[in-house]
Amino acid sequence: MRRSAVAVLAAGLFFTGAGSAVADAWRNMPTLKSTGVKLTKGKYRMYPKFTKHGGFGFKANLVDDEHGDGHNVYVQARVEGYSWRRFNGQQKKTVRIQKEVYDGAALYVSNAYIRACRDRGSLRPDNCTRTLHYTRR
C-alpha cells in the first residue's frame, strides 16, 4: 500500500514538472526587418520565478543587411518599467545573440518588448523594426 502511494506521488510530481517545462519552452519569434537590419531565427521565453530572475530570454540572429552602408546594428529589449537594454552586433556580419532581460526587484516579469535597429550615427536617427510585445501566459 505504501509503495503504491509513493509511486503515485512520484508519478504526479514527474508529470507536474514535465508540464511546467513545456509551459516555459522556447517560442518562435517572427522575423523583424527594417532597412539595413534583420532579426531572424528568433525564439523567446518567459522564465519562471527563481529561474534566471524570472526574466525575458531571447535568442536570434542579428544580421547587418546592408554591408556597404558602414553602419552597425543592435537589438534593444526591455521589461516593464525599465529602459531599453542594448546588445550590439557587428558590421557586415551575422551575430547570434542570446540574452536575458529582467527586473531585479521582482520575482518575474509580465511584459517584455524587443526590436532591432541600425545605428546611423549621431546626426541621423536610427531606424528600427516594429516592436514586439510579449506577455507572460
Segments (PLM) and residue ranges:
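Secretory targeting and sorting signals
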Residues: 1-23
